[in-house]
Amino acid sequence: QRQMCIRDRTHLSGHGRNENDAEHAWHMAIMAYLLREYANERVNIERVMIMCLIHDIVEIDAGDTYAYDAEGLKTQKAREEAAKERIFSLLPDDQKKELSALFDEFEANETPESRFAHAMDNLQPLMLNNSNGGGDWREHGVSAKQVYARQNKTKDGSLKLFEVIDEILQKHIRLGNLK
């Protein structure tokens, strides 16, 4: 329930409010399931979906760090590691071990599953930004270079989805939503 109180910087399409972490995680998980055929490699979709659902759970304690916040990114790892230890310690040992391992796998971004989960983490807010006319990028002064730096990592999980992302970004550059 606490995840519903943590607001991301991205606005929900047609709702005039920011998305919360629970919505972000759910959107990612359902997108992963629906888009799994576009993963670069065969993936265990259950593992991907669980990664999607838990990847931001540490923000209950650590708070949300905006993807383009250079200062916040400096302390993000330490804050999130402490939060992970506290939150997962509430679980029975077997579940703590399983979810901690999946969380660490997501963070390391070295397996087909974690790379595809990261692709969903990149794609999902981009889709919301696209649906709100690039408003969040304009509001926060985000440049095309910043978005491409983040989105280039999507290629590791899905080259096909990156092609769609590139088309969306080129459209927003033409429209002046990204400089």
Which residues fall in each region the model found?
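Short, small-residue-biased leader/transition segments that mark boundaries at the very start
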Residues: R2-C5
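Charged phosphate-binding loop/patch that engages nucleotide di/tri-phosphates or the phosphate backbone
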Residues: G157-K179
